[in-house]
């Protein structure tokens, strides 16, 4: 069939640290609301990291029965909830669809550390015979896609991408390709994560990847000269991607069009991005080429923007390498300045952000940004902007050198 089918966004759902729906999340973004606060899941007395961006007031009973909830860890519950919102938002009636042409591409970077910690404690205290039979199906990361498919009767291609912090973006990109090539008419796609646990916080702290600031206003500050690590977040964002003619036939509302997907690998280091930014630059240019858009046509980038020292420096170099002098004309922001780093869900949350920005003609500010160092001399959006957003490019860069970019455009016939 070839790569000639247009793909549009027709539904969205979100469970985030600043709101448990797309509407709540987006209102929070426009208000500059941050989701950072003391970790409540466990006692952090012995931990250097005290803050996280936790989801608040999440009730799985709103989205599933008690039996289903007991058979899912929180990362799966988040995904099923966000997927339900997205499917409802899209007005997708599975009784009217060929279920084998509706697929699922929902990734998690880690899966359930909670299940692993809980059952490891049981192993050490009571022996191997007392480890729960549900450990594996509760823990493994592909169960997000599995549970979403089970919950909503999705019998088409089912994918679980695991590329660390690029997971959500790759998941949406692979769903896009699936529709382009005719293997599905509709894909439920995105990412989910719930890793604010003792071992999760301890492990990322040992990497010196997390911010140790105890001031919520100065913890996640992408591109700021005082940035010192990311704040771990949690949640899920899921979108409904649909082949254009299929969407039009059923009278679906169309939020935006997904027109480009680019990837690369740094092949450089297990945690650090390539210092010259060449890998991320290639992913961005590949997405633009895929979408038939010249670099100088782009006006806005939703950056990976984690608030680590390396990311701020190396992603800036990547943007300059990809766009040359035009880099200075771009508006660049980081959604992580408000919700922290949702790891495998980050790219999906930022994709939803870009869709809303295109829809409303609004570019949010990078909250907490005060002053940058000399090499970080681009426009990182200290202020928000009300303006037409014809295209939005969103970047995700994962441990292991995984780079992915998606290009969205304002939908026109």
Over which residues does each language-model region extend?
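ACP-dependent fatty acid/polyketide chain-elongation machinery
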Residues: 1-68, 245-257, 352-366, 409-413
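Condensing-enzyme catalytic core mediating Claisen C-C bond formation in acyl metabolism
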Residues: 6-10, 37, 215-291, 300, ...
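Conserved beta-ketoacyl condensing-enzyme motif
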Residues: 9, 25, 30-163, 192-201, ...
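A glycine- and small-aliphatic-rich helix-loop capping segment at beta-alpha/alpha-beta transitions
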Residues: 23-28, 114-128, 178-181, 201-214, ...
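Active-site-adjacent elements of ketosynthase-type condensing enzymes
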Residues: 45-54, 111-115, 194-220, 262-282, ...
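Active-site-proximal alpha-helical scaffold in enzymes
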Residues: 79-92, 141-145, 149-193, 231-252, ...
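Phosphate/pyrophosphate-binding loops at sites that engage ATP/ADP/AMP, CoA/4′-phosphopantetheine
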Residues: 86-98, 151, 247-251, 284-300, ...
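Glycine-/small-residue-rich "gating" segment that lines the acyl/pantetheine channel
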Residues: 125-132, 170-173, 177, 193-249, ...
């Amino acid at each position: 069939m070839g790569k000639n089918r247009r793909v549009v966004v027709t539904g969205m759902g979100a469970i985030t640290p600043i709101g448990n729906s797309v509407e709540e999340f987006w209102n929070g973004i426009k208000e500059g609301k941050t989701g950072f606060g003391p970790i409540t899941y466990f006692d952090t007395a012995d931990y250097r990291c005290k803050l996280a961006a936790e989801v608040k007031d999440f009730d799985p009973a709103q989205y599933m029965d008690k039996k289903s909830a007991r058979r899912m860890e929180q990362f799966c519950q988040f995904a099923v909830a966000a997927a339900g919102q997205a499917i409802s938002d899209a007005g997708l009636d599975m009784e009217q669809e060929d279920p084998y042409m509706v697929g699922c591409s929902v990734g998690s970077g880690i899966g359930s550390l909670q299940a692993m910690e809980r059952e490891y404690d049981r192993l050490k205290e009571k022996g191997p015979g007392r480890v729960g039979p549900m450990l594996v199906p509760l823990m493994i990361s592909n169960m997000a896609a599995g549970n979403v498919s089970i919950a909503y009767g999705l019998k088409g291609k089912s994918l679980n991408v695991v590329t660390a912090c690029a997971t959500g973006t790759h998941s949406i990109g692979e769903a896009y390709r699936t529709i382009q090539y005719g293997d599905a008419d509709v894909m439920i796609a995105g990412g989910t994560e719930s890793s604010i646990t003792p071992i999760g916080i301890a492990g990322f702290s040992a990497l010196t990847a997390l911010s140790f600031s105890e001031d919520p206003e100065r913890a996640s500050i992408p591109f700021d000269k005082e940035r010192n690590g990311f704040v771990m977040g949690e949640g899920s964002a899921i979108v409904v991607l649909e082949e254009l003619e299929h969407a039009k036939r059923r009278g679906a509302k169309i939020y935006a069009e997904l027109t480009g997907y680019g990837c690369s690998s740094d092949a450089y280091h297990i945690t650090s991005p390539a210092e010259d930014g060449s890998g991320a630059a290639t992913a961005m240019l590949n997405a633009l080429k895929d979408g038939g858009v010249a670099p100088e046509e782009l006006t806005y980038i939703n950056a990976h923007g984690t608030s680590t020292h390396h990311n701020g420096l190396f992603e800036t170099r990547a943007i300059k390498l990809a766009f040359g002098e035009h880099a200075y004309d771009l508006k660049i922001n980081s959604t992580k300045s408000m919700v922290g780093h949702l790891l495998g869900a980050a790219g999906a949350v930022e994709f939803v952000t870009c869709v809303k920005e295109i829809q409303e003609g609004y570019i949010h500010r990078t909250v907490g940004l005060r002053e940058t160092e000399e090499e970080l001399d681009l426009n990182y959006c200290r202020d928000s902007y009300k303006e037409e957003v014809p295209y939005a490019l969103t970047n995700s860069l994962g441990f292991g050198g995984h780079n992915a970019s998606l290009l969205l455009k304002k939908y026109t016939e």
